[in-house]
C-alpha cells in the first residue's frame, strides 16, 4: 500500500473504513429540543415534527451547492444566446425547465436521505461490473466536459479583469488552484464551504442584477415572456438548448451525496420525512434564485441584441466586448461587472465539479483514498485537457464556440445514464422502503425524463447531421447510436425486472 512520509497510507484499507460520503464527525448536528422529544411517540406515527426556522437554517446548504450547476458558464452562455436570438419569448421555457430540474434534484435528495447512500454507491450495487464501469466512464466524461466549460469561463473572466495581460491558459492554471482552496475549506467543516458558495451566488446575483438594472428591459414584455408560451421555427434550436443545459448529469450524483452532510436518524421514519421536507424547501428557494439570475442574463442580452446583426455571433468569449459596446462604461463598466459575475459562476461550478468527482469515483469504484489525493486526481482529469484547449484555442473565438458545442453534445449524451438509474432506484421499495415514489410522482418523473432525453436526442441528431459527413464517419455514428440506444434500453429493462436487493431504507413506523 502506498505510504506518505509519516507512514500514513494514501489508500485506506477496505476492512478499516467503508466508503461513505461523509464521516459521522463531518456531519452537521441537527439540534433537537425537549418539547420535540416529548412529541416523539406521537409524531413517529404521523409525519414530521412542527416546522422550525432554526432547523431550516441547519438544513440549508446542499440545495445551494446543487444550484450552482444551474448557473455555470455553460448555462450563462445558453442564456445569453437565447436572449439575443429569441428575445423574451423563451423565458416561460426557462421557468418550466428549472421546475423540471427541481423535480429531478428532489428525487436525488430523496434517494440520498432515505437510503443513507448516494447514487454512485447504489449504482455500484445495482448493476453488474461491465454496466457500472460504463456508467462510471460516462459520468466522468460528463464531468470533464462540464469542467472544461467552467474552467474556460473562469479563464475568460480573468482575462477580462486583467485587461488581457493574463492569457486563457494562465487563467486555467489560476482556476485550478480552487482545488486546494476547496480542500482547505473542507477541513474546517461543510458549513464553511457552504458559506463560501453563498458568497459566490450572492456575487452572481448582485452582478447580473446590476446589469439588469442598467439594461432597463421592458417589464410588460418580460412578464409576457414568462407567462405566455411562444415558440417558432427560428427559436426552436435555442429552446432545445435552454432545456438541454438545465439538467447536468454530475449534479444528480452530487445532490444525493450532499444531503448526507446532515445528521438524520434513518431508523425513525418521521426524521427522514422531516429532512425531506426541509431539503424540499431549501432546494426550491435555491433554484428560484438561480432562475432569477438566469432571467437577468437572458433579459440583458434580449434587450441589447435581439433583432440585431450581432444576435447570432454572441458567445461567452465575446459577450463582454459586445456588452461594453452596447451599454458603455460609466463608473462601473459593464464589461467588468459581467466578468465578476462570470468569474463567480466559473469558480463556484469548478469547486462543485471537484466535489462531484470525489463522490462519483469513490461511489462507483469503492475507491477509498485520502480526500486530498482523490480531489487532486479528479481535478487533474479536467485541468490537463483544459490547459491544452486553452493553449491551442486562446485567440480563436470561433473555434472555442465550436468546442463548446461539442462539449454540450458530450454532456447531452450522458444525461440518460444519470436519470434512468435514479428513477429506477427511487421507484424500488427494496431500496427506498416506504419512501419510494408513488404512481403519480413516478409517472410525472418518467415523463420529464423522457422529455429531457428526447430533447437532447434532437440536439444530438441535429448536431451530427450538420457536422458529420462521409461514409466512415456516418458508419461510426450509426454504430455508436445503436450501441447507445441498446444500453439505454438495457438500463430501463433492468430497472423494471431486477429486484434482488437485500438492502432497504430503514424506517420505523
Curated annotation (Swiss-Prot):
Inducing or repressing factors: By iron starvation and infection with the bacterial pathogens P.syringae and E.chrysanthemi.
Topology within the bilayer: Multi-pass membrane protein
Gene Ontology terms describing biological process: defense response to bacterium; iron ion transport; manganese ion transport; positive regulation of reactive oxygen species metabolic process; response to bacterium; response to zinc ion
Tissues and organs where the protein is expressed, per its UniProt entry: Expressed in vascular tissues.
GO MF term set: metal ion transmembrane transporter activity
Compositionally biased residues, Low complexity: 1-12
Keyword check for Membrane: yes
Keywords: Ion transport, Iron, Iron transport, Membrane, Transmembrane, Transmembrane helix, Transport, Vacuole
Region of interest: Disordered: 1-25
Gene Ontology, cellular component aspect: Golgi apparatus; plant-type vacuole; plasmodesma; vacuolar membrane; vacuole
InterPro entries: NRAMP_fam
Tagged with keyword Protein biosynthesis: no
Coiled coil: none
Acidic residues composition bias: residue spans: 13-23
Primary subcellular site in the record, as a coarse category: membrane
Membership in a protein family: Belongs to the NRAMP (TC 2.A.55) family.
Identification of the protein by name: Metal transporter Nramp3
Lineage: Eukaryota, Viridiplantae, Streptophyta, Embryophyta, Tracheophyta
